[in-house]
Every structure is written in C-alpha cells, then in structure tokens.
Amino acid sequence: MIEPLDSPASDSDFLDYPSALGNCTDEQISFKMQYLPVIYSIIFLVGFPGNTVAISIYIFKMRPWRGSTVIMLNLALTDLLYLTSLPFLIHYYASGENWIFGDFMCKFIRFGFHFNLYSSILFLTCFSLFRYVVIIHPMSCFSIQKTRWAVVACAGVWVISLVAVMPMTFLITSTTRTNRSACLDLTSSDDLTTIKWYNLILTATTFCLPLVIVTLCYTTIISTLTHGPRTHSCFKQKARRLTILLLLVFYICFLPFHILRVIRIESRLLSISCSIESHIHEAYIVSRPLAALNTFGNLLLYVVVSNNFQQAFCSIVRCKASGDLEQGKKDSCSNNP
C-alpha cells in the first residue's frame, strides 16, 4: 500500500520517489519509452509543417482578414510554439526519462504544453461565440465581424492563458533519481495539496466553462438551422462539419486528459493499491498525447472554416482546384465571423 501524501514530502523522500512507489512506476517508464516518443514524433512531423503552411497562408494569402482569420492565425501560432517543444520531450522519453536540458527548460517545456492547451481551448471558444453571434443574431454580426474585436479577443486569450498557467512554473519540478535527471509533469511533482486545488480551479475555469459554452453554442446553432427559416444547404452543411469537428476536439482530445489528470492527482493523495495507481497512471499517460492531437483537429478546422483557405493551399502546393471547390467558393456562405 502507498502511504497517503497529505503533506509535502521531504527532500530525501522526493529524491527517492521511484523507490517510494516500488514497482508502481516501473512499467510506466517502459511504456512511456515505447508510446510517447512515437506519438509525439507523428504529431510533430504532421503538425509542424502543417501549421507552418497554415500561418503562411493566413499572413500572405488570405485577404481581406475577417474575425475568424485573426482567431485561426493565433490558434496556428500557439500550436506551432507547442510543436517546437516536442523534440525535447521525444528525446526525454526515448532516453528513459533522462532530462539533459536543465531545470529552466524543464519548466519551460511543461509550461508550453499547458499554455498551448488552454490557449487552444480559449481560441476555439472565441471562434464558437463568434459563429453563434453570426448565425443566431445576424443583425449584430456586422459589428463583431470587424477584425478589431477579434484582435481584442485574441489578446485577452493570450493574457488569460499566461496568467492561468504561470503557477506551473513554481509547481513543476525536476529532480535527480538513479543518477538521472527527471523532468516531472504537474501530476508527478511535489506539493500535491497545492497542485490538487490549483488543478481543480484551472480545470473548472479554463476547460469546463469553455466546454459548456462551446456545447451550448453549437447545439443552439444546429437547432436554429434545422428548424429556422434559413435553409441554405451549403450553410447548414458547413455548420454541421464545424460542429462535429469542434465537439470531437473537445470531447475526444481535451475531456479524457482533464478527467484523468484529476484522478491521477487524487490517486497520489489517497492510500490505494499499487496496481490501481499503476492503471490510473497508465491511462493518464495515454491521455497526454491525445490532448496534443488537437493540433490535428485544428489543421482540419482551417480547411473547413474557409473555402479561400482551400484555394490558397492549392496555390501553394501547385495544384488546381477541382470544379467542386470552385463552385463551393462561389456558393460558400460568407458569414464567417
């Protein structure tokens, strides 16, 4: 049985963390060596060039800029910043959790993951609210479509994300164990009581609330388009695609990670069997790159949101748009926020 961790561990206990847990984490270290480098490598190899191309399109090809263009550009930027940190994590897990880049980089890389996570959540929430106003309150959309409102919203997202994630630089720790430096994530760091309450507040304000907002926005949008007078097939089809994509990102990528992070922290605070804690930790490990897969969903979102983006992408890769794409551009609903 594992002793409850109701108070901060001593330095000797902390440095002997794997020994204190016995065999609870032995299999996880091996599992992480096999699983995380592969998944993170795939995410990096697809996401880095994909977001680089997306940013280039938004900056050099997309004119005029709408509110949605500003939000999508900021979303691509935060994804790209996160993707640049993945090679460090790939090396770390592939080497058996041996961190060679120092304490500052440990905190910076862990900070980068969570900053991207909550920036993405908030940018997608802003986009959903803009779509809601355009479709449900179309008379107000002429004001909200102006790019200055999107710029203000994006600036707010950057500030809120920075403030929300900043405490992690103090809570996340690195340590030395068995002659190796380990860069611990939030759930494995010390001071669990503080981490528990910080995690609950962070999850409630920057995930649960946006999840409710996004769900309500898109259920209202679909209901309005289904029963309302606006029945343009192109508009309805595009709204359905956006709804499915956004809800998949929130419920498949983000939700499991947040649920399992709460459970993982609680499992370290409670006196439970090594077997149960091992299974909880393993499930949490699986959920971490799953959360990072939102970068794939975002790449699809760029294409779904705008037919102009599709045309610009085709021009970059030197391909000719199909007749359907040309027709889609003519018939596309131009009410993007």
UniProtKB/Swiss-Prot annotation:
Keywords: Cell membrane, Disulfide bond, G-protein coupled receptor, Glycoprotein, Immunity, Innate immunity, Membrane, Receptor, Transducer, Transmembrane, Transmembrane helix. Disulfide bonds join C106-C183. Its main location: membrane. GO terms for cellular component: plasma membrane. It is a multi-pass membrane protein. GO terms for molecular function: AMP binding; G protein-coupled adenosine receptor activity; G protein-coupled receptor activity; purine nucleoside binding. Glycans are attached at N23. CDD domains: 7tmA_OXGR1. It is found in: Cell membrane. Predominantly expressed in the kidney with limited expression in the testis and the smooth muscle. Expressed in SLC26A4/pendrin-positive type B and non-A non-B intercalated cells (at protein level). The chain crosses the membrane at residues 39-59, 70-90, 117-137, 152-172, 201-221, 243-263, 285-305. Residues 1-38, 91-116, 173-200, 264-284 are extracellular. GO terms for biological process: adenylate cyclase-modulating G protein-coupled receptor signaling pathway; phospholipase C-activating G protein-coupled receptor signaling pathway. Residues 60-69, 138-151, 222-242, 306-337 are cytoplasmic. Belongs to the G-protein coupled receptor 1 family. PANTHER family: 2-OXOGLUTARATE RECEPTOR 1, PURINOCEPTOR-RELATED G-PROTEIN COUPLED RECEPTOR. G protein-coupled receptor for dicarboxylates and amino dicarboxylates. Receptor for itaconate produced by activated macrophages upon bacterial infection. In the respiratory epithelium, couples the binding of itaconate to the activation of GNA11 and downstream intracellular Ca(2+) release, leading to mucocilliary clearance of airborne pathogens. Receptor for leukotriene E4 (LTE4) produced by mast cells upon allergic inflammation. Binds with high affinity to LTE4 and elicits mucin release from pulmonary epithelium in response to airborne fungi allergens. This is 2-oxoglutarate receptor 1. It comes from Mus musculus.
